[in-house]
Curated annotation (Swiss-Prot):
GO terms for biological process: translation. Keywords: Methylation, Ribonucleoprotein, Ribosomal protein, RNA-binding, rRNA-binding. InterPro entries: Ribosomal_uL11, Ribosomal_uL11_bac-typ, Ribosomal_uL11_C, Ribosomal_uL11_C_sf, Ribosomal_uL11_CS, Ribosomal_uL11_N, Ribosomal_uL11_N_sf. Belongs to the universal ribosomal protein uL11 family. One or more lysine residues are methylated. GO terms for cellular component: cytosolic large ribosomal subunit. The lineage of its organism: Bacteria, Pseudomonadati, Verrucomicrobiota, Methylacidiphilae, Methylacidiphilales. Forms part of the ribosomal stalk which helps the ribosome interact with GTP-bound translation factors. Pfam families: Ribosomal_L11, Ribosomal_L11_N. This is Large ribosomal subunit protein uL11.
Amino acid sequence: MAKEVSAIVRLQIPAGQANPAPPVGPALGQHGVNIMAFCKEFNAATQKEAGNILPVVITIYKDKTFTFVTKSPPASILLKKAANIASGSKEPNRTKVGKVTKAQVKEIVKIKWKDLNASTEEAAMRMIEGTARNMGIEVVE
């Protein structure tokens, strides 16, 4: 029989850099999970992606054990890297802060494909382009 789920915790943690300090410690500590065990497992699983912030979904069971699933980095972070900017525009409709090409958008779609809710590559590209527009990043040919 399957274990009974106690809680599901969603966090965004830099790959390979989980430690018991906030936000990881308090989020897991309140559910009675062994925080150091999670940090060691997460860091070992995400060493190859160092430098990226990864969303992680942690499933905590009644017996205080856990499993976790890492997702692809958020589209906004990938777009900021592609456009070489520190942050998005405060007024995206008026002020453009950077540019990305369609080819860069296509690369981001390849990275994010498993986490996107799109049936075609074109639809996924439109989703990423929409995120770029909302950040004040111009999409050029």
